[in-house]
Amino acid sequence: MTTMARQERVRRAIEFQRPDRVPIVFWNRNQTEGDVLLYHLALGAPGDGTANAWDWSVNEWGYHLVKSGDGTMGHPVEPVYRELPRTVAAVSDRRKVGPDRGAGRIDDTARPAVAPYHDRRSATAATGEEFRVPALREEERMSAAPAFFEKCGDRYRLASFDLSGFTVYTFLRGFENAMQDFLLEPEGFAALMDRIVEFECDLMRMAARHGFHGIHFADDWGTQSGMMISPPLWRELFKPRYAKQFALAHELGLHTWYHCCGEFVEIMDDFREIGVDVLNISQPNVNDIAEVGRRLRGRQCFMMPISYQTVSITGTPADIYAEAERLHRLLGTPDGGFIGYVEEYSVMGMSERNYCACGEAFRRLRC
Protein backbone atom coordinates (compact mmCIF):
# COMPACT_ATOMS: atom_id res chain seq x y z
CA MET A 1 0.00 0.00 0.00
CA THR A 2 1.40 3.40 -1.03
CA THR A 3 1.88 5.87 1.82
CA MET A 4 0.19 9.23 1.28
CA ALA A 5 2.57 12.19 0.90
CA ARG A 6 2.59 14.22 4.10
CA GLN A 7 1.65 17.51 2.43
CA GLU A 8 -1.26 15.72 0.78
CA ARG A 9 -2.32 14.22 4.13
CA VAL A 10 -2.47 17.68 5.70
CA ARG A 11 -4.30 19.21 2.75
CA ARG A 12 -6.90 16.46 2.82
CA ALA A 13 -7.45 16.89 6.54
CA ILE A 14 -7.97 20.64 6.09
CA GLU A 15 -10.30 20.23 3.11
CA PHE A 16 -12.24 17.20 4.43
CA GLN A 17 -11.02 14.87 1.68
CA ARG A 18 -10.27 11.74 3.72
CA PRO A 19 -6.60 11.69 4.75
CA ASP A 20 -5.16 8.26 5.48
CA ARG A 21 -4.65 9.23 9.14
CA VAL A 22 -4.71 12.23 11.46
CA PRO A 23 -1.80 14.59 10.62
CA ILE A 24 0.46 15.70 13.47
CA VAL A 25 2.39 18.93 13.98
CA PHE A 26 5.40 18.92 16.31
CA TRP A 27 5.73 22.62 17.04
CA ASN A 28 8.95 23.38 18.87
CA ARG A 29 10.85 20.09 19.03
CA ASN A 30 11.24 17.01 16.81
CA GLN A 31 9.49 18.76 13.91
CA THR A 32 10.61 16.16 11.41
CA GLU A 33 8.55 13.52 13.25
CA GLY A 34 5.42 15.31 12.04
CA ASP A 35 3.68 16.16 8.80
CA VAL A 36 4.31 19.93 8.90
CA LEU A 37 7.46 22.04 9.13
CA LEU A 38 7.31 25.61 10.41
CA TYR A 39 9.21 28.56 8.91
CA HIS A 40 9.55 31.72 11.03
CA LEU A 41 8.96 34.93 9.08
CA ALA A 42 9.71 37.36 11.92
CA LEU A 43 13.08 39.12 11.86
CA GLY A 44 14.97 41.22 14.31
CA ALA A 45 15.82 44.85 13.66
CA PRO A 46 18.38 45.17 10.85
CA GLY A 47 21.63 43.64 12.04
CA ASP A 48 20.01 41.93 15.03
CA GLY A 49 19.63 38.15 14.89
CA THR A 50 19.41 35.65 12.05
CA ALA A 51 16.66 34.60 9.68
CA ASN A 52 14.29 31.78 10.69
CA ALA A 53 15.39 32.03 14.35
CA TRP A 54 14.24 33.89 17.44
CA ASP A 55 17.72 34.98 18.46
CA TRP A 56 17.10 38.71 18.03
CA SER A 57 16.84 41.10 20.96
CA VAL A 58 14.81 43.84 19.22
CA ASN A 59 12.07 42.82 16.78
CA GLU A 60 11.84 44.47 13.35
CA TRP A 61 8.79 46.43 14.56
CA GLY A 62 10.90 47.86 17.38
CA TYR A 63 9.57 45.99 20.40
CA HIS A 64 11.86 44.22 22.84
CA LEU A 65 10.90 41.00 24.61
CA VAL A 66 12.59 40.80 28.00
CA LYS A 67 13.42 37.20 28.87
CA SER A 68 13.19 35.97 32.43
CA GLY A 69 15.33 32.87 31.97
CA ASP A 70 12.43 30.43 32.27
CA GLY A 71 12.45 29.23 28.67
CA THR A 72 9.54 31.38 27.50
CA MET A 73 9.73 33.90 24.65
CA GLY A 74 9.75 36.83 27.07
CA HIS A 75 7.50 39.80 27.66
CA PRO A 76 7.39 43.37 26.32
CA VAL A 77 7.93 45.86 29.13
CA GLU A 78 8.07 49.15 27.22
CA PRO A 79 5.66 50.41 24.54
CA VAL A 80 7.35 51.46 21.33
CA TYR A 81 4.85 54.28 20.77
CA ARG A 82 3.74 56.06 23.93
CA GLU A 83 1.60 58.27 21.72
CA LEU A 84 -0.23 57.24 18.57
CA PRO A 85 1.55 58.33 15.38
CA ARG A 86 -0.08 61.37 13.83
CA THR A 87 -2.32 60.76 10.81
CA VAL A 88 -1.65 62.50 7.53
CA ALA A 89 -3.31 62.77 4.14
CA ALA A 90 -3.07 59.83 1.79
CA VAL A 91 0.48 58.94 0.86
CA SER A 92 0.76 58.77 -2.91
CA ASP A 93 3.07 55.78 -3.08
CA ARG A 94 0.92 53.51 -0.93
CA ARG A 95 -1.45 51.02 -2.48
CA LYS A 96 -5.24 50.90 -2.37
CA VAL A 97 -7.97 48.36 -2.74
CA GLY A 98 -9.12 48.12 -6.33
CA PRO A 99 -9.31 45.79 -9.29
CA ASP A 100 -6.18 47.26 -10.84
CA ARG A 101 -4.15 47.41 -7.64
CA GLY A 102 -4.27 43.82 -6.40
CA ALA A 103 -6.29 42.03 -3.77
CA GLY A 104 -5.98 42.70 -0.08
CA ARG A 105 -4.72 46.28 -0.31
CA ILE A 106 -5.71 48.65 2.45
CA ASP A 107 -7.14 52.09 1.71
CA ASP A 108 -4.97 55.05 2.68
CA THR A 109 -7.34 57.91 3.39
CA ALA A 110 -5.67 58.66 6.74
CA ARG A 111 -2.29 57.29 7.62
CA PRO A 112 0.51 57.89 10.08
CA ALA A 113 3.61 59.46 8.65
CA VAL A 114 5.95 56.66 7.67
CA ALA A 115 9.70 56.72 7.99
CA PRO A 116 12.02 54.05 6.60
CA TYR A 117 13.02 51.53 9.23
CA HIS A 118 16.19 52.39 11.07
CA ASP A 119 17.76 51.54 14.38
CA ARG A 120 15.12 52.19 17.00
CA ARG A 121 17.73 53.44 19.43
CA SER A 122 18.17 56.57 17.31
CA ALA A 123 14.48 56.95 16.50
CA THR A 124 11.97 59.43 17.91
CA ALA A 125 8.94 57.19 18.39
CA ALA A 126 8.02 58.82 21.69
CA THR A 127 7.14 62.06 19.87
CA GLY A 128 4.25 60.38 18.07
CA GLU A 129 5.40 61.92 14.79
CA GLU A 130 6.36 58.86 12.80
CA PHE A 131 5.65 55.18 12.49
CA ARG A 132 8.27 52.88 11.06
CA VAL A 133 7.00 49.96 8.97
CA PRO A 134 9.57 47.17 8.60
CA ALA A 135 11.14 46.70 5.18
CA LEU A 136 10.28 43.45 3.40
CA ARG A 137 13.95 42.34 3.36
CA GLU A 138 12.98 39.41 1.15
CA GLU A 139 16.47 38.13 0.44
CA GLU A 140 17.37 38.07 4.13
CA ARG A 141 13.97 36.78 5.26
CA MET A 142 14.09 33.92 2.78
CA SER A 143 17.80 33.13 3.18
CA ALA A 144 17.04 30.04 5.27
CA ALA A 145 14.33 28.82 2.89
CA PRO A 146 16.43 26.60 0.56
CA ALA A 147 17.72 24.49 3.47
CA PHE A 148 14.24 24.50 4.99
CA PHE A 149 12.63 23.23 1.78
CA GLU A 150 15.25 20.50 1.43
CA LYS A 151 14.52 19.41 5.00
CA CYS A 152 10.77 19.49 4.34
CA GLY A 153 10.78 16.77 1.72
CA ASP A 154 7.13 15.92 1.13
CA ARG A 155 5.93 17.71 4.28
CA TYR A 156 3.52 20.63 4.41
CA ARG A 157 5.34 23.99 4.40
CA LEU A 158 3.83 26.43 6.91
CA ALA A 159 5.09 30.02 7.08
CA SER A 160 4.36 31.79 10.36
CA PHE A 161 4.10 35.45 11.28
CA ASP A 162 5.07 34.15 14.75
CA LEU A 163 3.07 36.97 16.32
CA SER A 164 0.54 38.95 14.33
CA GLY A 165 -2.06 41.70 14.12
CA PHE A 166 -3.62 42.50 17.47
CA THR A 167 -0.67 41.11 19.42
CA VAL A 168 1.82 43.25 17.49
CA TYR A 169 -0.41 46.29 18.09
CA THR A 170 -0.41 45.70 21.85
CA PHE A 171 3.38 45.34 21.83
CA LEU A 172 3.76 48.63 19.97
CA ARG A 173 1.39 50.60 22.17
CA GLY A 174 1.41 48.68 25.45
CA PHE A 175 -1.62 46.63 26.49
CA GLU A 176 -3.41 49.30 28.52
CA ASN A 177 -2.89 51.97 25.86
CA ALA A 178 -4.11 49.57 23.16
CA MET A 179 -7.33 48.83 25.02
CA GLN A 180 -8.02 52.54 25.36
CA ASP A 181 -7.21 53.19 21.70
CA PHE A 182 -10.03 50.91 20.55
CA LEU A 183 -12.63 53.22 22.12
CA LEU A 184 -10.93 56.59 22.63
CA GLU A 185 -8.68 56.84 19.55
CA PRO A 186 -10.50 54.92 16.79
CA GLU A 187 -8.91 56.85 13.91
CA GLY A 188 -5.40 56.54 15.29
CA PHE A 189 -5.99 52.87 16.02
CA ALA A 190 -7.22 52.24 12.47
CA ALA A 191 -4.24 54.00 10.94
CA LEU A 192 -1.69 52.04 12.93
CA MET A 193 -3.51 48.70 12.74
CA ASP A 194 -3.89 48.92 8.98
CA ARG A 195 -0.13 49.40 8.61
CA ILE A 196 0.40 46.15 10.48
CA VAL A 197 -2.20 44.35 8.36
CA GLU A 198 -0.69 45.74 5.16
CA PHE A 199 2.79 44.54 6.07
CA GLU A 200 1.44 41.07 6.82
CA CYS A 201 -0.26 41.04 3.42
CA ASP A 202 3.11 41.74 1.82
CA LEU A 203 4.63 38.85 3.79
CA MET A 204 1.85 36.55 2.54
CA ARG A 205 2.59 37.49 -1.07
CA MET A 206 6.24 36.73 -0.44
CA ALA A 207 5.44 33.36 1.18
CA ALA A 208 3.26 32.39 -1.77
CA ARG A 209 6.00 33.35 -4.24
CA HIS A 210 8.40 31.01 -2.46
CA GLY A 211 6.13 27.98 -2.48
CA PHE A 212 4.66 27.74 1.01
CA HIS A 213 1.37 25.92 1.49
CA GLY A 214 -0.09 27.86 4.41
CA ILE A 215 0.25 31.02 6.51
CA HIS A 216 0.05 30.98 10.31
CA PHE A 217 -1.47 33.81 12.36
CA ALA A 218 -0.99 34.04 16.15
CA ASP A 219 -3.26 36.30 18.18
CA ASP A 220 -4.57 35.64 21.67
CA TRP A 221 -8.11 36.91 22.22
CA GLY A 222 -9.10 34.98 25.31
CA THR A 223 -8.42 35.01 29.02
CA GLN A 224 -9.08 31.98 31.21
CA SER A 225 -12.77 32.89 31.40
CA GLY A 226 -13.69 35.02 28.39
CA MET A 227 -12.53 37.46 25.76
CA MET A 228 -10.31 40.49 26.30
CA ILE A 229 -12.75 42.72 24.42
CA SER A 230 -16.45 42.31 23.72
CA PRO A 231 -17.44 40.21 20.69
CA PRO A 232 -19.37 43.18 19.16
CA LEU A 233 -16.26 45.40 19.37
CA TRP A 234 -14.10 42.59 17.96
CA ARG A 235 -16.51 42.23 15.03
CA GLU A 236 -16.40 45.96 14.38
CA LEU A 237 -12.64 46.52 14.60
CA PHE A 238 -10.92 43.25 13.75
CA LYS A 239 -13.20 40.90 11.86
CA PRO A 240 -13.21 42.99 8.62
CA ARG A 241 -9.42 43.23 8.68
CA TYR A 242 -8.98 39.51 9.17
CA ALA A 243 -11.51 38.85 6.40
CA LYS A 244 -9.38 40.86 3.94
CA GLN A 245 -6.24 39.01 4.96
CA PHE A 246 -7.82 35.57 4.73
CA ALA A 247 -9.34 36.39 1.33
CA LEU A 248 -5.92 37.43 0.06
CA ALA A 249 -4.33 34.25 1.41
CA HIS A 250 -6.87 32.14 -0.45
CA GLU A 251 -6.33 34.10 -3.67
CA LEU A 252 -2.63 33.35 -3.27
CA GLY A 253 -3.32 29.64 -2.80
CA LEU A 254 -2.46 29.58 0.92
CA HIS A 255 -4.39 27.88 3.70
CA THR A 256 -4.98 30.08 6.73
CA TRP A 257 -3.97 28.72 10.15
CA TYR A 258 -5.05 30.71 13.19
CA HIS A 259 -3.78 30.27 16.76
CA CYS A 260 -5.65 31.66 19.74
CA CYS A 261 -5.12 31.18 23.45
CA GLY A 262 -7.84 31.55 26.06
CA GLU A 263 -11.61 31.14 25.96
CA PHE A 264 -13.05 32.52 22.72
CA VAL A 265 -16.03 30.32 21.85
CA GLU A 266 -18.18 33.36 21.07
CA ILE A 267 -16.17 34.25 17.96
CA MET A 268 -15.18 30.81 16.65
CA ASP A 269 -18.08 30.80 14.20
CA ASP A 270 -16.88 34.19 12.95
CA PHE A 271 -13.46 32.77 12.15
CA ARG A 272 -15.06 29.99 10.10
CA GLU A 273 -17.26 32.56 8.33
CA ILE A 274 -14.36 34.75 7.23
CA GLY A 275 -12.11 31.97 6.03
CA VAL A 276 -9.92 30.38 8.70
CA ASP A 277 -8.98 26.94 7.39
CA VAL A 278 -7.27 25.58 10.51
CA LEU A 279 -8.31 26.86 13.95
CA ASN A 280 -5.85 26.16 16.76
CA ILE A 281 -7.74 26.21 20.07
CA SER A 282 -4.64 26.46 22.18
CA GLN A 283 -6.34 25.94 25.56
CA PRO A 284 -9.03 23.27 25.17
CA ASN A 285 -9.36 23.08 28.95
CA VAL A 286 -11.01 26.54 29.15
CA ASN A 287 -13.27 26.14 26.10
CA ASP A 288 -16.49 24.11 25.87
CA ILE A 289 -15.23 21.66 23.25
CA ALA A 290 -18.53 19.79 23.09
CA GLU A 291 -20.31 23.04 22.22
CA VAL A 292 -17.63 23.92 19.66
CA GLY A 293 -18.14 20.52 18.05
CA ARG A 294 -21.90 20.98 17.91
CA ARG A 295 -21.40 24.26 16.08
CA LEU A 296 -18.47 23.55 13.81
CA ARG A 297 -17.65 19.85 13.51
CA GLY A 298 -17.49 18.90 9.84
CA ARG A 299 -17.12 22.53 8.71
CA GLN A 300 -13.96 23.68 10.48
CA CYS A 301 -10.60 21.94 10.64
CA PHE A 302 -9.07 22.12 14.12
CA MET A 303 -5.47 21.84 15.30
CA MET A 304 -5.64 20.64 18.90
CA PRO A 305 -3.11 20.10 21.69
CA ILE A 306 -3.47 18.01 24.80
CA SER A 307 -3.94 20.82 27.31
CA TYR A 308 -0.57 22.08 28.49
CA GLN A 309 -2.23 23.59 31.55
CA THR A 310 -3.86 20.40 32.79
CA VAL A 311 -3.80 16.91 31.24
CA SER A 312 -0.37 16.92 29.59
CA ILE A 313 1.19 18.38 32.75
CA THR A 314 -0.45 16.45 35.59
CA GLY A 315 -2.08 13.51 33.80
CA THR A 316 -0.79 10.02 33.08
CA PRO A 317 -0.11 8.71 29.57
CA ALA A 318 -3.47 6.92 29.78
CA ASP A 319 -5.14 10.26 30.56
CA ILE A 320 -3.40 11.82 27.57
CA TYR A 321 -4.52 9.03 25.22
CA ALA A 322 -8.11 9.40 26.47
CA GLU A 323 -8.06 13.17 26.01
CA ALA A 324 -6.80 12.87 22.42
CA GLU A 325 -9.64 10.45 21.69
CA ARG A 326 -12.17 12.82 23.29
CA LEU A 327 -11.02 15.82 21.28
CA HIS A 328 -11.03 13.82 18.06
CA ARG A 329 -14.47 12.38 18.75
CA LEU A 330 -15.96 15.83 19.40
CA LEU A 331 -14.21 17.74 16.60
CA GLY A 332 -12.96 15.33 13.93
CA THR A 333 -14.85 13.41 11.24
CA PRO A 334 -14.13 10.38 9.04
CA ASP A 335 -13.43 12.87 6.25
CA GLY A 336 -10.85 14.86 8.24
CA GLY A 337 -11.04 18.17 10.06
CA PHE A 338 -8.56 17.35 12.82
CA ILE A 339 -4.79 17.86 13.22
CA GLY A 340 -2.84 16.86 16.33
CA TYR A 341 -0.55 19.45 17.91
CA VAL A 342 2.45 18.56 20.09
CA GLU A 343 4.51 21.18 21.92
CA GLU A 344 7.28 20.58 24.43
CA TYR A 345 6.37 22.46 27.61
CA SER A 346 8.87 21.47 30.29
CA VAL A 347 8.74 25.13 31.34
CA MET A 348 5.17 24.41 32.50
CA GLY A 349 6.16 21.19 34.24
CA MET A 350 5.60 18.73 31.38
CA SER A 351 7.61 15.56 31.86
CA GLU A 352 9.51 13.85 29.08
CA ARG A 353 7.19 10.87 29.48
CA ASN A 354 4.11 13.02 28.94
CA TYR A 355 5.66 14.86 26.00
CA CYS A 356 6.25 11.53 24.26
CA ALA A 357 2.75 10.39 25.20
CA CYS A 358 1.22 13.41 23.44
CA GLY A 359 2.81 12.39 20.16
CA GLU A 360 1.82 8.77 20.64
CA ALA A 361 -1.77 9.77 21.50
CA PHE A 362 -2.25 11.43 18.12
CA ARG A 363 -0.47 8.63 16.25
CA ARG A 364 -3.06 6.21 17.61
CA LEU A 365 -6.00 8.15 16.15
CA ARG A 366 -7.69 7.10 12.94
CA CYS A 367 -9.94 9.28 10.81
Where do the protein language model's features map onto the residues?
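Helix-coil boundary/capping segments in enzymes
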Residues: 31-89, 107, 121-122, 126-144
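Active-site loop segments of alpha/beta catalytic cores
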Residues: 1-25, 29, 84-367
